[in-house]
Amino acid sequence: MIKSKIVLLSALVSCALISGCKEENKTNVSIEFMHSSVEQERQAVISKLIARFEKENPGITVKQVPVEEDAYNTKVITLSRSGSLPEVIETSHDYAKVMDKEQLIDRKAVATVISNVGEGAFYDGVLRIVRTEDGSAWTGVPVSAWIGGIWYRKDVLAKAGLEEPKNWQQLLDVAQKLNDPANKKYGIALPTAESVLTEQSFSQFALSNQANVFNAEGKITLDTPEMMQALTYYRDLTANTMPGSNDIMEVKDAFMNGTAPMAIYSTYILPAVIKEGDPKNVGFVVPTEKNSAVYGMLTSLTITAGQKTEETEAAEKFVTFMEQADNIADWVMMSPGAALPVNKAVVTTATWKDNDVIKALGELPNQLIGELPNIQVFGAVGDKNFTRMGDVTGSGVVSSMVHNVTVGKADLSTTLQASQKKLDELIEQH
């Protein structure tokens, strides 16, 4: 019996030393990367990145899982319930909060990647947006961002003898002077529909006046003097916009067809501006009241919880690889101008410097990147990001509040009080 054990042990040792043993071939690990780039040209870019990674890491295979944006969140839920979540998932900072709340994120793995890349690799303020609610971890590794603000036609303002508006009062003055509803020309295109865009746009003004939906203790703070001032201002500003409920298409079309020389929109208006042929005629500004507040949405790559050790380690390697200068530049430049780099290394690459779109925009990309430290979002207070903000946005209470006082001409004080009550009840349920 002892002898047979020795023979078996010898065989195992021999097998371990011989490269031809079949067990050696089982070192390959396969991981999945879920993202929203369903367009063929974008998938081609990602395929090249994956091929580059696999060449550097011959034991790892990465499979793309492209999912339409509209079906994205549902797909995450479906896959999580069946225990088949991809190891790496592209996600907005908003949805990452939901994933973290459901304990779908491997916080330790995300922290490992951020440690590998270095916190200093990111622009100031970026990592703050992906902080967990308790401020102790991150929900993902940021790869790009878009921001929103006021876009304006330089020639129209110059012809009217008006300067770039720097604060609330100046913006209102410019909008009023350019407003000519009798001729179907309006001072500014603003979202007023019961939509996420309306909440995002209003949030810039509220946060600029130090009004937030939550306070540091996680209590709802909608019915405050600061929020009342912001809502009053937004209502006054909408007196100079197109009548009715305006959403994404109405705002964008009004700016692009000359109906309004100013508009609140994200950097995703830039492809249309470039196509128009004179991008340097368009300026960008974030009007400030008590402080500067720009709405921004970060895209991150997150690593999911519950995977095998070797899969998690492979995912860490892949996301770390994606943050290397040339790789992250290729990712960001799938949407040049519209998607902003959050990793400082991007602007040092030839991919960025030699891009025709970036060249055509002149100093604007640098100006937009310079706004990243000013990103503020509802539900983020200090180093805390309240996950319940997702429930607030999902409820539509804030956008309905704005819609009701602008389009519906409802009483401000009554509307604020009613909205506060609705959110108090909502938070008590969760």
UniProtKB/Swiss-Prot annotation:
Keyword check for Signal: yes
Gene Ontology cellular component list: ATP-binding cassette (ABC) transporter complex, substrate-binding subunit-containing; membrane; outer membrane-bounded periplasmic space; plasma membrane
Subcellular location: Periplasm
Stored InterPro entries: Bact_solute-bd_prot1, SBP
KW Transport (keyword) present: yes
SUPFAM superfamilies cross-referenced by the UniProt entry: Periplasmic binding protein-like II
Keyword annotations of the record: Periplasm, Signal, Transport
GO biological process: transmembrane transport
Gene3D superfamilies from the UniProt entry: Periplasmic binding protein-like II
Primary localisation category: periplasm
Domain of life of the native organism: Bacteria
Signal sequence residues: 1-19
Family per record: Belongs to the bacterial solute-binding protein 1 family.
Function noted in UniProt: Probably part of the binding-protein-dependent transport system YcjNOP.
Name of the protein described by the UniProt record: Putative ABC transporter periplasmic-binding protein YcjN
Name of the gene encoding the protein in the UniProt record: ycjN
